[in-house]
């Protein structure tokens, strides 16, 4: 018994030490965010330019890794230009790449715009853990009034957990949902999804 307790205690101590080291590693890595020291690539978005590190971008996103490959024009020009997102969205995405966290404005936001854009960015750049955070945030905004719009968003970007949550809201409030203008638009513009919804209800 004593030997077993000693082994268990040693394992706990080892796990705690490993967790401490991982926390320290994350803190050290976060210090490089927007730090020009050793930066070797610039990410441009609108009027904003972010100094970044190729190895970190490539390690965190296989899409960015492809963009930074030796065959790409970005390699020669030493920059990536992003034109399909606002600078604030790219700032938040880069912060997540470096720190694994999103900024307070994301968590404090009272509308779904930023979470929607970050979900879109996470899907495009294949940042699965960021995508999961965005799904969770968007799920907190789910109401009868917007459940169909959120469902369409989730379906478009393969946000499966968010889609499941939206379907549950629709199912619980189907009488109201099926009489809404959003439902008419869904049937017209997203017929396959409308069939999926009705099959689920039946």
What spans do the regions from the language model cover?
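A periodicity- and composition-biased signal for non-globular, repetitive helical segments
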Residues: 10-11, 60, 66, 169
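A structural signal for well-ordered alpha-helical scaffolds and beta->alpha junctions
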Residues: 22, 86-90, 163
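Generic alpha-helical structural element
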Residues: 14, 18, 82-83, 123, ...
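BTB/POZ-protein C-terminal extensions
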Residues: 79, 103-120, 133-202
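Eukaryotic cytosolic interaction/assembly regions at protein N-termini and domain boundaries
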Residues: 1-29, 37-39, 185, 189, ...
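Canonical BTB/POZ domain core
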Residues: 31-144
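Short, functionally important structural connectors and interaction interfaces within domains
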Residues: 17, 21, 25, 30, ...
């Amino acid at each position: 018994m004593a030997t077993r307790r000693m082994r268990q205690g040693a394992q706990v101590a080892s796990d705690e030490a490993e967790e401490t080291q991982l926390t320290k590693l994350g803190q050290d890595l976060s210090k490089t965010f927007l730090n020009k020291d050793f930066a070797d690539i610039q990410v441009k978005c609108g009027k904003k330019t972010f100094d970044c590190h190729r190895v970190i971008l490539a390690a965190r996103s296989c899409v960015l890794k492809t963009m930074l490959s030796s065959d790409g024009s970005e390699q020669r020009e030493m920059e990536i230009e992003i034109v399909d997102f606002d600078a604030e969205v790219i700032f938040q995405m880069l912060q997540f790449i470096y720190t694994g966290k999103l900024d307070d404005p994301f968590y404090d936001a009272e509308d779904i715009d930023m979470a929607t854009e970050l979900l879109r960015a996470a899907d495009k750049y294949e940042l699965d853990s960021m995508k999961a955070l965005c799904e969770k945030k968007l799920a907190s905004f789910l109401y009868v009034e917007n459940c169909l719009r959120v469902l369409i968003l989730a379906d478009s970007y393969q946000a499966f957990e968010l889609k499941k949550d939206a379907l549950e809201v629709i199912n619980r409030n189907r009488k109201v949902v099926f009489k809404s203008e959003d439902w008419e638009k869904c049937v017209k513009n997203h017929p396959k999804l409308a069939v999926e919804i009705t099959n689920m209800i039946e």
